[in-house]
Amino acid sequence: MDKGFKYNLPRCSCWYWILLIKDRQGFKTGDMKHAICCYNFLRKWLQSHKKFISNPLYITGDSYSGMIVPIITQAISDGSDIEAKRVLNLKGYLLGNPFTYAKFDGNSKIIYYNRMALISDELYESAKSKCKQEYIDVEISNRMCVKDLQTISECTAHINTMRILEPYCPSELPNVRKYLLGTHEDSLHLSDGYPQFGCRNYYCYLCKVWATDISVQKALHIRKGTIKEWVRCNKSMDYDYDVASVVSYHLCLNTRGYRALIYSGDHDLAVTYGGTESWIKSLNLSIVDDWRPWIVDGQVAGYSREYGNNFTFATVKGAGHTTPEYKPKESFSMFKRWISQQPL
């Protein structure tokens, strides 16, 4: 169960963060270092802001944070010293559209394509048989499997990965999402220009224009001359994807009784709800309240399933990657009910 982690927590001093800001080109980080430094920052911040110490603490995130949040949460639960246990009033964690383990998240895409009528039943059954339900680590010598996967790729190459119902828009995605999605190169093309007006990711371009504006930088108290052009994603960063799976962290945290809410947009192709269901099922938790709809303003907002030890999985109907971006009202209702310990 990831033994040894709690004995090797390096300290991240203020100089560490200064180096992060001043030397972006040379900064090297990764999954574990990211999680450890977030943990240490949180612990030290609460020590410096003692009025918040007694507040219930929930760690949250979405997308690739699915690889980071469980590590942070377990680090807090372990406690690197007596002081940490006294300071952090940990109650649980929340994750939306979370990347968790490539084997589950990646293999689920083929199933999702078929469920959403993006590929035919015949093609799905052929790939399922020839690839033996393994679509990530495929032997190049298995030519029939490779051929089916190529056909599937051609059928789905121009589907919007973030939300399959929206128009396909080539987007300037960060490197972390390239790793996360593990899908078509065309849809991951890094545009030299900016997204087409009307595409959802056009707001990323607007953010760049806004943050580069001198008056905005002045209002934010950014030191004059330090940022000539704001960059949303630093592609030069040396990032080490050193954690393959965090499934064991979820199991450990559930065993310790921490509350968990895992939710997915059911039209998200980046991290499909089916992939999330797969790793949750691998935990072998007992089902307390089986699959049922949850309602907002008299309408079905999604579906939920409650597992033992306060572990909840929910889908949000019509939402993409990430869920609150597409369904803010429903997402807030879900969060408000869960944080108040009410049924969804």
Say what each PLM segment does.
Residues 1-344:
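Terminal and linker regions of secretory-pathway proteins
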